[in-house]
A protein has these predicted regions:
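Von Willebrand factor
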Residues: 146-184, 197, 219
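Residue-level marker of alpha-helix boundaries and capping positions
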Residues: 111, 193, 258-259
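Von Willebrand factor type A / integrin I
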Residues: 1-33, 37, 42-43, 180-182, ...
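An amphipathic, basic-hydrophobic helix/alpha-beta surface used to engage anionic
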Residues: 1-145, 185-189, 222
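A short, compositionally biased
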Residues: 130-132, 151-152, 226-229
């Protein structure tokens, strides 16, 4: 008896898998980290100083941090103490729309996205993580101590998305509803296709106050055709129905296909690099652990 699709090992996403990711995701620096598969965009926001407390002056305190108004009022020196914003709040937006439930080789892009989300959550376990799943129902959940509830949410919302039902709201709609706290960093995990203008507008607004790291997932079939065989394709939209073949054995067609794919990727980079601090590209034909440990996901 054949397995149900959601139970197939290349499709299923289990909580033990996400728990095991911590074994390699929390390493300080992946081996060979110089091969980072990312590009720098606009300059990042420098961590600011947050006022922590006011106390009586002590030897060694910075003179420039003396509060002269309080000192004059009380007749003895008082110092304002500050702490640097090292522990940024981290908001993670994961796209689980139907387009992410595609994969031509070893996995669905949505599953790789969930694994990446889990790795980033484990990496920043001591930060305040907030997870937003863009799917049938946009889900928003903040970390309260353990990261386990966030990992359980990833499994649950991934499972819901396997139905591939059309969404009533766009990724731009979900972005427009994100209210980030001061100094928070936003990580977005989504498809590799060029952004709609509405998404670019939302990114532009958010980037004024927040650092944005943008992860794109690209399937091997979205980069080039296999050299042998034909792949059936069908387009079925209102007022548009088409059936045909992608012929990887035809050298001219295969070359034009690859050129179009590269042009699309380049166009997406040109859109995003002025709007985000870091732009990453993940290969859906490789495991996340392989890309992480080879340094392709290094964020340094």
């Amino acid at each position: 008896m054949p397995l149900a699709p959601e139970l197939h090992p290349d499709i299923a996403l289990s909580l033990p898998l996400l728990l095991n990711i911590r074994l390699w995701a929390k390493a300080r620096k992946p081996p060979n980290a110089g091969r980072s598969n990312s590009e720098r965009g606009k300059p990042g926001r420098s961590p600011g100083l947050t006022f922590r407390e006011l106390r009586a002056y002590q030897a060694g305190d910075e003179v420039r941090h003396i509060d002269w108004r309080v000192t004059a009022r009380l007749g003895r020196p008082f110092t304002r103490l500050y702490s640097e914003e090292l522990d940024q709040a981290h908001w993670l937006l994961l796209d689980l729309s139907p387009a992410m439930y595609f994969g031509s080789t070893r996995q669905l892009k949505a599953r790789l996205g969930c694994e990446l989300a889990a790795a980033l959550i484990w990496q920043g376990e001591k930060q305040h993580n907030t997870l937003i799943c863009h799917g049938l129902i946009s889900h928003h959940q903040s970390q309260r101590g353990s990261v386990l509830p966030l990992l359980e949410s990833l499994c649950h919302h991934y499972q819901q998305g396997l139905a591939r039902r059309a969404l009533s709201h766009s990724l731009a709609d979900t972005l427009s509803g994100v209210k980030l706290p001061h100094g928070a960093k936003l990580t977005i995990i989504t498809d590799h296709r060029p952004c709609e203008s509405a998404i670019c507008q939302q990114l532009q607004l958010l980037s004024r106050r927040h650092d944005i790291h943008y992860w794109q997932i690209r399937d091997p079939l979205e980069a080039a055709l296999p050299s042998d065989g034909q792949l059936p394709v069908a387009i079925d939209r209102p007022g548009q129905h088409y059936q045909g073949w992608l012929d990887g054995g035809h050298a001219g067609f295969s070359r034009r296909y690859q050129q179009a794919a590269e042009q699309q990727l380049t166009h997406g980079k040109q859109q995003l690099l002025p709007l985000v601090q870091r732009l990453y590209l993940l290969d859906n034909g490789q495991t996340l652990q392989q890309q992480w440990q080879e340094g392709l996901c290094h964020q340094g």
